[in-house]
């Protein structure tokens, strides 16, 4: 069904990706306002960000397994309804505990939505277009960084911190309407059982793919987590220009997502290995380039491009190696990305606490990318060894 209907269905899913990407990052830009509005200090308000991430990590595997036999269209619609309601609720609470609960619930549909959405999108196009279809859903995240996050942050600062959550809820509602209208029933029926989904966890290649995401993306997050002080302290870019720098990063993400489909034609594992190698080199040089404002901005753009090529490739790889348990594996990919976020930021904080300077988080990131590259090479080698006896037997 690669037609106008497929395009509309993928667009509907991308709208959901845009809503999710906006709510995931907007809280970070409004921490002072949210802290004041809920009567806590800024460090405590950071828990709201952690609550959302925890919801992603916990919700993705649980929902994927429990919803294995349900029609995927029904599950996707239900996930977006829950997401929209939780975001609207986030704007109606003004104390710490209720907002923590609302943000946790808001995060729970995140991984399952992208995981199931990727499977649905891939089912609507020919096999050689699967990575492109997955990238088009994930591009919603990238566009959110360019448009959604800056706009809702501005509105939150000018009108009130609750407004962005209500806007995200409205976008989520629009996504629900679009999915009901445009997602085909026949292409989105889950055929896997509870045991089929869990069986994916017995496959070595699934764990290797998840490890690539955790370690490889940890390198990117170790750099991005400290991008603002890196730009102001090393590159000398004024703080007022940081939103522009972040928008350039978002444009890089869009470029990477669009490019991923073409890279996939070279082979999924070749693309993964090549992307990780490029990420490692880029991060190794990043700390030196950051001392020049022009080079710093160029490298921020590249920091958006290269990992965004890798995400759809990894998602496709998990579909290939999970066999019957594709729903769980695809959802777990987004749990690992949030784990990578925490891992990278933590390792970056260690070198900064040691007084090594803002050049070093990206160098730590380069080491993580090299480790991810090693895991990818191991995965490819094991894949060839497994395929060889089968071909000989045939």
Q: What annotation goes with each model-predicted range?
A:
Residues 11, 82, 86-89, 97-106, ...:
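Paired small-residue
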Residues 169-189, 375-379:
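C-terminal membrane-cytosol helix-exit motif in multi-pass small-molecule transporters
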Residues 60-72, 256-268, 352-353:
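Helix-to-loop junctions at the C-terminal end of transmembrane segments
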Residues 58-97:
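Conserved MFS/SLC helix-loop-helix module at the cytosolic interface between two early adjacent transmembrane helices
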Residues 39, 71, 92-98, 236, ...:
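Helix-breaking motifs and short loop linkers at transmembrane-helix boundaries and internal kinks
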Residues 270-314:
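C-terminal transmembrane helical hairpin of 12-TM major facilitator-type secondary transporters
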Residues 102-140:
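Cytoplasmic helix-loop-helix junction between adjacent transmembrane helices
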Residues 321-358, 365:
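A late C-terminal transmembrane helix in Major Facilitator Superfamily
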């Amino acid at each position: 069904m690669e037609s106008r209907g497929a395009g509309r269905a993928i667009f509907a899913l991308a709208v959901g990706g845009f809503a999710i990407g906006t709510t995931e990052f907007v809280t970070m830009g409004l921490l002072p306002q949210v802290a004041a509005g809920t009567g806590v200090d800024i460090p405590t308000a950071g828990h709201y960000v952690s609550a959302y991430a925890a919801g992603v990590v916990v919700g993705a595997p649980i929902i994927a397994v429990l919803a294995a036999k349900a029609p995927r269209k029904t599950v996707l619609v239900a996930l977006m309804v829950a997401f929209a309601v939780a975001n609207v609720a986030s704007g109606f609470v003004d104390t710490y505990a209720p907002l923590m609960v609302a943000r946790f619930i808001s995060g729970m549909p995140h991984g399952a939505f992208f995981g199931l959405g990727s499977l649905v999108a891939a089912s609507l196009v020919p096999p050689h277009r699967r990575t492109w279809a997955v990238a088009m859903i994930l591009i919603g995240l990238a566009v959110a960084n360019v448009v959604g996050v800056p706009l809702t942050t501005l509105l939150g600062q000018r009108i009130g911190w609750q407004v962005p959550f209500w806007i995200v809820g409205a976008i989520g509602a629009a996504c629900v309407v679009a999915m009901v209208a445009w997602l085909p029933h026949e292409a989105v029926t889950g055929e896997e059982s509870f045991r089929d989904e869990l069986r994916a966890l017995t496959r070595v290649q699934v764990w290797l793919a998840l490890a690539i995401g955790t370690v490889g993306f940890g390198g990117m997050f170790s750099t991005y987590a400290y991008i603002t002080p890196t730009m102001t302290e090393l590159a000398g870019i004024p703080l007022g220009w940081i939103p522009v720098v972040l928008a350039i990063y978002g444009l890089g993400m869009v470029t990477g997502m669009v490019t991923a489909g073409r890279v996939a034609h070279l082979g999924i594992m070749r693309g993964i290995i090549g992307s990780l190698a490029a990420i490692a080199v880029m991060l190794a040089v990043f700390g030196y380039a950051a001392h020049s404002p022009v080079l710093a901005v160029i490298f921020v753009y590249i920091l958006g491009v290269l990992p965004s090529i890798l995400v759809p490739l990894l998602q496709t790889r998990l579909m290939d190696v999970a066999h019957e348990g594709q729903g769980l594996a695809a959802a777990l990919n987004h749990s690992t990305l949030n784990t990578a976020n925490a891992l990278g930021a933590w390792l970056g904080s260690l070198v900064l606490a040691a007084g090594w300077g803002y050049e070093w988080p990206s160098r730590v990131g380069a080491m993580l990318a090299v480790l991810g590259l090693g895991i990818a090479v191991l995965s490819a080698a094991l894949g060839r060894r497994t395929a060889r006896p089968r071909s000989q037997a045939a």
